[in-house]
């Protein structure tokens, strides 16, 4: 599901709220979550999961085109850990 698909689905379920208001709310929520993570803070949504930053240590990588070794700096990357309720709901899914 993309961001625009999420907005469309929420707008169709909440017909009393203008689609533009739903779009603005979703964009504002995502922007607030991104800025919270950028400040190094953890986000926890009970029953859904938590977002945090994990540190990746410096390492030697490879350029996929040339195969040459490349030194990669350490960096922080976003990490999502699903909550128990989300894990349980996703576990029922069968292809």
Swiss-Prot record:
- Keyword Transcription appears in the UniProt entry: yes
Pfam families in UniProt: Bac_DNA_binding (PF00216)
User: What CDD domains does the record point to?
Assistant: IHF_B
What family does the Swiss-Prot or TrEMBL record give for this protein? Belongs to the bacterial histone-like protein family.
The opening ranks of the lineage are: Bacteria, Pseudomonadati, Pseudomonadota, Gammaproteobacteria, Enterobacterales
Spell out the PANTHER family in the cross-references: DNA-BINDING PROTEIN HU, INTEGRATION HOST FACTOR SUBUNIT BETA
Kindly list the GO molecular function terms attached to this UniProt entry: DNA binding; structural constituent of chromatin
The subunit field of the Swiss-Prot or TrEMBL record says: Heterodimer of an alpha and a beta chain.
Function noted in UniProt: This protein is one of the two subunits of integration host factor, a specific DNA-binding protein that functions in genetic recombination as well as in transcriptional and translational control.
Does the UniProt entry include the keyword Transport?
Answer: no
List the keywords (alphabetical): DNA recombination, DNA-binding, Transcription, Transcription regulation, Translation regulation
At the top level of its lineage, which domain of life is listed? Bacteria
Q: Which GO terms describe its biological process?
A: DNA recombination; regulation of DNA-templated transcription; regulation of translation
Q: Name it.
A: Integration host factor subunit beta
- Provide the Gene Ontology terms for cellular component: chromosome; cytosol
Question: Do you know which SMART domains this protein is assigned to?
Answer: BHL
This chain's source organism reads Klebsiella pneumoniae (strain 342)
């Amino acid at each position: 599901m993309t961001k625009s698909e999420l907005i469309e689905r929420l707008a169709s379920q909440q017909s009393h709220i203008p689609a533009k208001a739903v779009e603005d709310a979703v964009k504002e929520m995502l922007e607030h979550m991104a800025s919270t993570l950028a400040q190094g803070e953890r986000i926890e949504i009970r029953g859904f999961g938590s977002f945090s930053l994990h540190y990746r240590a410096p390492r030697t990588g490879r350029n996929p085109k040339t195969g040459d070794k490349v030194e990669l700096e350490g960096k922080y990357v976003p990490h999502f850990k699903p909550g128990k309720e989300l894990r349980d709901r996703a576990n029922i899914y069968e292809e």
